[in-house]
Amino acid sequence: MAIKIGINGFGRIGRLVLRVALGRKDIEVVAVNDPFIAPDYAAYMFKYDSTHGRYKGEVTASGDDLVIDGHKIKVFQERDPANIPWGKSGVDYVIESTGVFTKLEGAQKHIDAGAKKVIITAPSADAPMFVVGVNEDKYTPDLKIISNASCTTNCLAPLAKVVNDTFGIEEGLMTTVHSITATQKTVDGPSHKDWRGGRTASGNIIPSSTGAAKAVGKVIPELNGKLTGMSLRVPTTDVSVVDLTVRLKKAASYEEIAQAIKKASEGPLKGVLGYTEDAVVSTDFLGSSYSSIFDEKAGILLSPTFVKLISWYDNEYGYSTRVVDLLEHVAKASA
């Protein structure tokens, strides 16, 4: 039986989750909710994408429906998740991708509206976080609301797991050089919580905070308190890169570290962690479905216990693919 899902929030992640889900035979997208997007506009936004290109199938709007390749998807425009008719529509799982309802209290409204389970596509202050390839095996069916963590945590955690499992991490610092996201400004504007974040996105390198490294401690308890990090927002539309600098417990050569990562990418983390020895740049990873692609040529080792590792990620498409993977895992575990 198909996994019946609804998507709340038809932004960058919501639309790409839909693209990915349409390619999975075991998933049926029943409905989309976004208070700011009517069916005809939803069709336009789904069909045309400045970053990932035009959708190759047929996309139209018909009444209250978004129609993709003949498949009808209900479009609701409710501001309050409690009012979305998930139950009446037969939706079992909700992908919460507004970026607003990231806590248990807000996400619970989807359950109240008839959904059985919710996956939040953002870090959560109180919902359990899962990263595919790292700790999804810890999921238990009694959990109704979970978080897929952030795109950066999804990039960092698989890399940190391999390094920690093989050599041990004493402590580390992470910097993500991160593409523009929707929260940034096209020109200088007010941003009271983050003054730098209010500066023109297209013309600046903007230092910012991120909880991605600390969140790794939630999905790999052994690393709790051992990692922290920051973000540099740069004027690219998509694809980001993690710079992880760590002190190792066990001495190793750079070649040994790279080989351990390569082995994991071909084994237990296949499809999640990638590996490349090519002379790549950011656009080479547009549309990549990996969470993290280790760049063997870009890292450096200062001493046998002090190393910098570089890993790329499509912060939109790779993350959206993992959301759908986590959904399938949850559905299977809950069956």
Curated annotation (Swiss-Prot):
Q: Active-site positions, per UniProt?
A: C151 (nucleophile)
> What does the record give as its pathway?
Carbohydrate degradation; glycolysis; pyruvate from D-glyceraldehyde 3-phosphate: step 1/5
One biological-process term from Gene Ontology?
A: glycolytic process
> What keywords sit in the KW lines?
Cell wall, Cell wall biogenesis/degradation, Cytoplasm, Glycolysis, NAD, Oxidoreductase, Secreted
Residues reported in the UniProt entry to bind NAD(+): R12, I13, D34, R79, N315
GO CC term (a single one): cytosol
Per the UniProt record, the site (Activates thiol group during catalysis) maps to H178
In the Enzyme Commission scheme, what number(s) does this protein have?
A: 1.2.1.12
Q: Does the keyword Cell wall biogenesis/degradation apply?
A: yes
* Record InterPro entries: GlycerAld/Erythrose_P_DH, GlycerAld_3-P_DH_AS, GlycerAld_3-P_DH_cat, GlycerAld_3-P_DH_NAD(P)-bd, Glyceraldehyde-3-P_DH_1, NAD(P)-bd_dom_sf
Q: Where in the cell is it found?
A: Cytoplasm; Secreted, Cell wall
CDD domains for this protein: GAPDH_I_C, GAPDH_I_N
Q: Record keywords: Cytoplasm included?
A: yes
Complex and partners:
Homotetramer.
The family annotation for this protein states: Belongs to the glyceraldehyde-3-phosphate dehydrogenase family.
Show the NCBIfam families listed in the entry: GAPDH-I (TIGR01534)
User: What is the protein named?
Assistant: Glyceraldehyde-3-phosphate dehydrogenase
Gene name?
TDH1
